Amino acid sequence: MIRVAVITLGCPKNQVESEYMLGILEKNHLEVVSDPRQAEVVIINTCSFITAAREEALDTILELARAANHPRLIVAGCLAQQYASELWQELPEAAAFIGPGATGRLPEIINRVLKGERVLDVPGPEMITGELPRLIEDGKPFAYLKIAEGCNNRCTYCTIPSIKGPYRSRPLEKVVAEAVSLAARGIKELVLVAQDTTAYGLDCYGEYRLPELLRRLARIEGIEWVRLLYAYPTRITPELIEVMATEPGVVPYLDLPLQHASEGVLRRMGRPGTGAAGLRAIESLRRAIPEITIRSTFIVGFPGEEEEDFQILLDFLTDARLDWVGAFKFSPEEGTIAASLPGQVPEEVKEERYQRLMLHQQSITRACNEGWLGREVQVLKEGPEVGRSMRQAPEVDGVVYVKGDPSPAGSMVTVKLTQLYNIYDFLGEIKL
């Protein structure tokens, strides 16, 4: 039996695509191994969103090429989609370059590379609609659920529309069917992802259908939590807020990437609104859902960002009191408008502002978390003595450590939060 390993780089959306790959491999009787050193073929599912992601992908490919077992390498994902023709010449170490649209042909491609053939299979942007099998790690209590592909927003710094194509919603019934299948396999939490989850439905139904989708998913037997990531600020509709406020299975949590608070910087980014508009949106959410947890991400060092703009961002964070914040240093991406804008910020200034922002936010996050000490919360176990509360999205926020709790992954337990382990993580006691 042919042994195949899959390495996933990048975002949760890539994780979903890797799980489809694993499902296809298993269905076609190929042996899936977790250790690439034991594999005859290694598939690297890459990201190319920013320079650092491309560098990580190339380093991974070259490291695997030097491995003692000399596996055949298949480069998949965004890097292959965007740069296949260049990489074909520059990376002879790779046996194949495939785009997401070639996922269904993986068994055939593997057979071809094992016969010594090099393969280039990068069709135009396509979407997996849900017919493919999906293999999820045993014992994992959550799954990312991709509801759309592509993006119609035109942020000046972003390559996603050119890589992934225009926004395409998956049919609602197919999303629900996949969710039912996941629940039947023991998944307790669905984490909705897309380039823009809040645009769901507009392209194929002529109206936003995310509220309806959330209701349907939250009422699936076996699903405890439905969590929403990658929301767009101007699409937080009253209907969406109502569903989040009234549907018990939809967790009071929203990932709302705002990117900046300075009006001038936002305008150069091609993003809507102002810092004041962002604050109003946050206040509306908190009025309707008093205990909502809000996460956001920001870019520092965007072209033209002056110290005054950066201070506006810090002041916004002080006023917004966001629970969780991630930040990126601007990376000029080939083919984007932002890469050629005047006023490029020196790398050392980007780094200094990044450090200041994260330090500034740490005290806010600590204060938010301290406000939960002494309270009892539901925790979804992810392993021995560790899990997450509703306030914590997988892999990006903190966790709750529950000493002496023997319940397995997937269990829902009541925990009293007793102290902070660090800024982001809690210690808790099981409540029997």
Curated annotation (Swiss-Prot):
Any single GO CC term annotated in Swiss-Prot or TrEMBL for this entry: cytosol
Alphabetized PROSITE patterns for the sequence: MTTASE_N, MTTASE_RADICAL, RADICAL_SAM
Cofactor mode of binding and number, as noted: Binds 2 [4Fe-4S] clusters. One cluster is coordinated with 3 cysteines and an exchangeable S-adenosyl-L-methionine.
EC number of the protein: 2.8.4.4
Reaction catalyzed: L-aspartate(89)-[ribosomal protein uS12]-hydrogen + (sulfur carrier)-SH + AH2 + 2 S-adenosyl-L-methionine = 3-methylsulfanyl-L-aspartate(89)-[ribosomal protein uS12]-hydrogen + (sulfur carrier)-H + 5'-deoxyadenosine + L-methionine + A + S-adenosyl-L-homocysteine + 2 H(+)
Domain called MTTase N-terminal: residue spans: 2-115
Gene3D superfamilies membership: Methylthiotransferase, N-terminal domain, Nucleic acid-binding proteins, tm_1862 like domain
Protein's cellular compartments: Cytoplasm
Residues binding [4Fe-4S] cluster 1, per UniProt: C11, C47, C78
UniProt binding sites for [4Fe-4S] cluster 2: C151, C155, C158
Entry keyword set: 4Fe-4S, Cytoplasm, Iron, Iron-sulfur, Metal-binding, S-adenosyl-L-methionine, Transferase
An individual GO BP term: tRNA modification
GO molecular function: 4 iron, 4 sulfur cluster binding; aspartic acid methylthiotransferase activity; metal ion binding; protein methylthiotransferase activity
Cofactors: [4Fe-4S] cluster
NCBIfam families: 30S ribosomal protein S12 methylthiotransferase RimO, MiaB/RimO family radical SAM methylthiotransferase
Assigned protein family: Belongs to the methylthiotransferase family. RimO subfamily.
HAMAP family for the chain: MTTase_RimO
PANTHER family linked to this entry: RIBOSOMAL PROTEIN S12 METHYLTHIOTRANSFERASE RIMO, RIBOSOMAL PROTEIN US12 METHYLTHIOTRANSFERASE RIMO
Function, as annotated: Catalyzes the methylthiolation of an aspartic acid residue of ribosomal protein uS12.
Protein name in the entry: Ribosomal protein uS12 methylthiotransferase RimO
Gene from which the chain derives: rimO
